[in-house]
Amino acid sequence: MSQTSLKQKKNEPGMRSSKESLEAEKRKESDKTGVRLSNQMRRAVNPNHSLRCCPFQGHSSCRRCLCAAEGTALGPCHTIRIYIHMCLLWEQGQQITMMRGSQESSLRKTDSRGYLVRSQWSRISRSPSTKAPSIDEPRSRNTSAKLPSSSTSSRTPSTSPSLHDSSPPPLSGQPSLQPPASPQLPRSLDSRPPTPPEPDPGSRRSTKMQENPEAWAQGIVREIRQTRDSQPLEYSRTSPTEWKSSSQRRGIYPASTQLDRNSLSEQQQQQREDEDDYEAAYWASMRSFYEKNPSCSRPWPPKPKNAITIALSSCALFNMVDGRKIYEQEGLEKYMEYQLTNENVILTPGPAFRFVKALQYVNARLRDLYPDEQDLFDIVLMTNNHAQVGVRLINSVNHYGLLIDRFCLTGGKDPIGYLKAYLTNLYIAADSEKVQEAIQEGIASATMFDGAKDMAYCDTQLRVAFDGDAVLFSDESEHFTKEHGLDKFFQYDTLCESKPLAQGPLKGFLEDLGRLQKKFYAKNERLLCPIRTYLVTARSAASSGARVLKTLRRWGLEIDEALFLAGAPKSPILVKIRPHIFFDDHMFHIEGAQRLGSIAAYGFNKKFSS
């Protein structure tokens, strides 16, 4: 009901109403008008509604424009026609309707690979555009809008819209004579649209996505489809990132990736620190256990990561020839039966037995000088025997008082695969095939041969003898001698006197021995040091001795005795030295030492010459 009819009713005779009834009736009319206008606005925002298209003075239907509802909110014969390019923002809790008439630029920038740059993916240009919207433009991606309403017709507050250079047409005072256009069906989406890039955090599109996620996604897909169809992509001919080297790819990763890696390394470092603390607590408890039990005469074992681990085969530590014969002649079951029957029979010492006794004496001396010392020899018994055979081995170890706490019984499986897990520094076995397998794994290994049983060895001093070439040093001198002769080799070595020799497989073990020797030297125990090293080489001191000694000096290593034989036999020297083990690469010298009763080891040259 209009205001004119209200005045007529007020002037008619017989219509006497109080001021309160008139005010109540006005409020009812205002409420009805507000409800009607809100319903019309809701229909106008609907994308399928007929008011979605806007006929205005010859202006054809534009999918980027939205015609507001026609109503009587502002009085009769007043029509609201507002053509807007909607971009909703949410700022400080208020909805702002941005009226824009901008249009995308037809020319899109691409990078070196032909992809659109990030700013080109945005449908709204950062700089306002005054170009009029085209008829062929796709329909607006936004399907929800808030129109500004009068304070008298709407109880919800709204702010005035912000305009760009192209302002909307003025309000018309005449109602529209054209019928509303029929609703247009939305275009079908592409079957496999490409994934749009990640939007900027401060962009307006994120606000649209929060307002209406479904409509925002449809608008993005239409935009990508239009961009892809309008201009083909041109790809650069540079090779992919995966083809580049790792050094070239480092610059491609963003800083966030580097931060993630740094944080990951910090986590790993923290985890290692926790593991170290747990391990330290465990070994502290082990030490307290040994100290609180006077009946336990065995000292606490060293930490594996700090110790010098020597892995021994059971055949190198004990004499197991009889059991080996039974296994080869009668099979595994008879061998197992034989070992179980004789598990209380103590095994006789093998070729590495005296070597182990000398290692234990060095550990005892180090514990006397350094009670908390962890840099000790740790012996591991490694065998492919069955676990039941281990009972006889344990009984024999305890009978001789050997401090061997770690066993590896693989039950017929090759134990070479466990060497690295045990942090092995040196592997000694009686089987040359096992030694070659360990060498292929990169572990210093040697085959130990037994000497004369009646020869006396010193148990209070560890004596280790090394050959020079292919043992402490590389085998390049042997190859040079074979190719050019001995005279040329002497001349070459004299010219290269100041050039250090390349390291050999046993250089690391000599470093370990030297590190332990320095612990005794620090306590003024040089003359009473329980470790003594020997260099027994066929080189000539006059021609190549200086280069050998300078190489050891360059490495920071000391050798107690250097014996240059100039091609003479080594066996008489080894008999005089009586080393617990002699590392040599030539089988001829080992056989000679074996005949004279010296314990020798072989098996190094294959690693460096192959």
Curated annotation (Swiss-Prot):
Residues 1-34, 101-277 are annotated as: Disordered. InterPro entries: 5-nucleotidase (IPR010394). It is an enzyme of class 3 (hydrolase). Its cofactor is Mg(2+). One of its GO terms (molecular function) is 5'-nucleotidase activity. It comes from the Eukaryota. One of its GO terms (biological process) is purine nucleotide catabolic process. Keywords: Cytoplasm, Hydrolase, Magnesium, Nucleotide metabolism. Highly expressed in testis, placenta and pancreas. Detected at lower levels in heart, kidney, liver and lung. Residues 167-183 have a biased composition (Pro residues). Its EC number is 3.1.3.5. It catalyses: a ribonucleoside 5'-phosphate + H2O = a ribonucleoside + phosphate; AMP + H2O = adenosine + phosphate. Activated by ADP. Residues 148-166 have a biased composition (Low complexity). It holds the Pfam family 5-nucleotidase. It is found in: Cytoplasm. The active site is at D467. Residues 119-132, 236-265 have a biased composition (Polar residues). Belongs to the 5'-nucleotidase type 3 family. Catalyzes the hydrolysis of nucleotide monophosphates, releasing inorganic phosphate and the corresponding nucleoside, AMP is the major substrate. PANTHER family: CYTOSOLIC 5'-NUCLEOTIDASE 1 FAMILY MEMBER, CYTOSOLIC 5'-NUCLEOTIDASE 1B. This is Cytosolic 5'-nucleotidase 1B. The gene is NT5C1B.
